[in-house]
Amino acid sequence: MGHYHRLTHIEFRHPAEERINGKSFGMSMQLHLRDMQGRLAAVSVLLVPSGSENPFIQQIWNHIPLVRNEPVAPPDVMLNIADALPKDQAYYTYMGSLTTPPCTEGVTWYVLKNPVAVSAEQIGIFARLYPNNSRPLQASSSRLIKESRGAMPASPSGGQGFAPAPAQ
């Protein structure tokens, strides 16, 4: 039997901290996960500007703190993470670290190959509030980057799926 990863939190980065084949992206959404053994994983969803607003992102933006680093209570809305992911969930994966101090190592990263469209205005709103909040591009340090042949497993660990984080 597989195991679950719990979504612990979502972070946004402007610009995206990842590059694919040298191409950079304006923004990314990082889904941070932890399994029952305490192992960390993160799914990076690259965001690209388009003409239309992304409803999932807009639900989050409706509750975004207007002052940097100001804590905000989670919105009283249900978010379906599947709505934030591209239809084709092919990915790259590697062992890396968290991108904020203390930059803990041992994080399994999944970078989705296919970006998700958001409006230029949605990127602009975040960029004005949180300009350049991403970690500089890091050297690969001989990390092995693997490419999927299909969609992400139901759980990044190959287990049964995601579950919401327990109430605190």
Place the predicted regions along the sequence by residue.
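Extracellular or lumenal secretory-pathway regions
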Residues: 1-26, 30-168
